[in-house]
């Protein structure tokens, strides 16, 4: 069984030729590729494809009902919130995802952000550009205090693949790892209710998915529980942290710093409280934690395996 496929938004995975599609081309008789697909073009671009590959294109129930031939939807990501799973299920269309493809890339970015904050790299680079070192009366600059990570407490909210990988890196730096309990009934050793974990940690790293129950999970109350010398890192999803409350805390000096790779709207077409350049001790990156070339290539390889499994009547990484 050989299937016809379409990739609706290749530009979100790699548009400069650094990601190869050979693995997909081997398992599909035809692969049509679109760099981007606006909402009004989804049904037209899908056409007679039997396999639809997408990353961020939204597949609504209305669109799915109009697909004439689709048998499998392959999401080039772990989260599948942009696909109406109920509509796919009702029409007998399978849906697969790619879990854990960017685990190491994510862990790498978390610590790139943490180290940048901790070492005050932005601030010291600014001093260098201003010629401060040339004018210094001694061999070094001590304008911004640097703390060692060793001996500090690293809190993890969301202990899946990425949370575990981040924890291993934290331990390599000599940090103690504390994990937030999943719920009030989670009594496993080493797990702490969120309200008990927050006051203890020097770093809080967030790795939970964005769900109705996790939206604004870290709001004004939770931010106030953190120590003033604590640092918050969010490479999970925008919307988990109350962005306006975080901006307020940073301006007031109630937190030592924060770094986020995600915002509640991406791209932030309508602005965002965290994009104010006057906010101190804040780093914002444009959702790049997952984007190592290796991770993006791994997505392609894994989707090809998902399609091959489907052709063989097997279930692999199926969410519907």
Label the predicted regions.
Residues 76-77, 93-104, 181, 236:
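Short beta->alpha connector loops at strand-helix junctions that form conserved
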Residues 1-49, 311:
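N-terminal glycine-/charge-rich "phosphate-binding" loop or analogous flexible N-terminal tail
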Residues 95, 229-320:
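Rossmann-like dinucleotide-binding domain for NAD(H)/NADP(H)
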Residues 91, 99-153:
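Phosphate-binding beta-alpha-beta segment of Rossmann-like dinucleotide-binding domains, i.e.
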Residues 162:
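Hydrophobic/small residue at the entry helix of a nucleotide-binding pocket
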Residues 59-65, 176-178, 182-273:
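Rossmann-like adenosine-cofactor binding region
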Residues 156-157:
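Conserved N-terminal Rossmann-fold NAD(P)-binding element of oxidoreductases
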